Amino acid sequence: MHPMNRYEVALVTGASSGIGKAIALELASAGLRVLALGRDRAALDELHSTAGIVPVVFDLSDVSEVYGKIAGEKIDVLVNNAGLLTASASLVDLSEDDIDAMIDINIRSVFKLTRHVLKQMIERRRGHIFFTGSSGGLAPHPNSSVYGATKAAVSLFSSALRCDLIGLPIRVTELFPGRVETNLYRTALGKEGAKKKLYDDNEAIQPEHMARLLRTALELPDFVDVTRLEVMPTGQVVGGAQMSKLSR
């Protein structure tokens, strides 16, 4: 059976803006009932009014609290998209709170929410789990040690999860976007800082591009699992960050 004929409910985290918002809209247009989880109530309410998407206002820093909000939902598609880059800084310039926050959102919440939803997917013998990774988890970049490490952890987790699920009709896909125009970098670098460093004179992937690719992977037959989707602007190369040795 074509998976889109039996997938009914999707949960998308980090859906207030950027890639998560675009994915929520794309899945709603495909006919799924979409639960959009995020912190921005106004943004989620707008998704509800424009596309009938169900808002779930929540901060994933304590993911166990979200279980009650999705109780009774038979989730067929889980999109672990929420991510946090607190600052673009070297390790010694990050606070311990910065480190804890990135680990909480980028790793702990992903592992726990996936475990929770996966139990019901196994019982119903159907489902597709997506992870939004990052090119920052594929190669080292300056001022990105903790963020890159969290994304590398999710990448290995995604691959290992496929091993756990071998023999079950549940698919796992990781998205690897390169330079994409979202609030993630605006939060870390500031609006003008992100514009100058990343977007001026550079073409960037748009969130809608990632959403379309996710839908393509989702719509393939059950026996076809796109395990990784690595997407870069044509002018970007992973590991191409320029670094210079500084005297101390």
Swiss-Prot record:
Listed GO MF terms: oxidoreductase activity
Keywords, comma-separated and alphabetical: Oxidoreductase, Plasmid
Binding site for NADP(+): 8-32
EC number of the protein: 1.-.-.-
Positions annotated to bind substrate: S134
Active site: Y147
InterPro entries with a match to the protein in the record: NAD(P)-bd_dom_sf (IPR036291), Sc_DH/Rdtase_CS (IPR020904), SDR_fam (IPR002347)
Oxidoreductase among keywords: yes
Enzyme class: oxidoreductase
Top-level division of the source organism's lineage: Bacteria
UniProt xrefs under PROSITE patterns: ADH_SHORT
Keyword Lyase: no
Family from the record: Belongs to the short-chain dehydrogenases/reductases (SDR) family.
Protein name as catalogued: Uncharacterized short-chain type dehydrogenase/reductase y4eK
Organism annotation: Sinorhizobium fredii (strain NBRC 101917 / NGR234)
Organism lineage string: Bacteria, Pseudomonadati, Pseudomonadota, Alphaproteobacteria, Hyphomicrobiales
